[in-house]
From Swiss-Prot:
Organism, scientific name: Eremothecium gossypii (strain ATCC 10895 / CBS 109.51 / FGSC 9923 / NRRL Y-1056)
Residue ranges of the TM segments: none
Region (Disordered): 46-76
First-listed, main subcellular location of the protein, grouped into a coarse class: cytoplasm
Organism lineage string: Eukaryota, Fungi, Dikarya, Ascomycota, Saccharomycotina
Keyword Acyltransferase: no
Biased composition (Basic residues): 46-68
Organism domain of life: Eukaryota
Entry similarity comment: Belongs to the CAF20 family.
Gene name of this polypeptide: CAF20
Name assigned to this protein: Cap-associated protein CAF20
Subcellular location per the Swiss-Prot or TrEMBL entry: Cytoplasm
InterPro entries in UniProt: Caf20 (IPR031456)
Amino acid sequence: MAKYTEEELLQLKPTYDVAVNFDVDAFKAMIAEVAEHHEIADLFHQKARRRSSHHHGVKPKIKAHKPRITTDDDGWCTSTRKTSVVAVGDDGEPSPAFVAQETLRVKPNNKNIASSRPADTRDIVADKPTMSFNAFAALESDDEDQF
């Protein structure tokens, strides 16, 4: 920004006068009203904050329930866990929980197979024995004992 001396500022002063019908008091009141409006807006303005990286979902609350500890007359403490909810029959015995039978289908991942022929699911499921090289067995050969 350019700095001016007092003489230069007096030379740059406008030579014409303010209009006769200009109301200075109304102009000052309007400036005060705008300044007050800006102060109120700044009071309620939330400044730009860094966005949080964990706003995608609510973090699950993992709370392990403590077991209930009961003390006997002899001073022995035993802990009892909360029993799971199982349907109880007429005789008071819990009925066995039924497990739904599901069939498991293996879907081959053809994009990692170099052949143009699609993979057979029987080949994927079957585990084939592999021959592996044992380095320690190779080091312990009978030829070294002869020397």
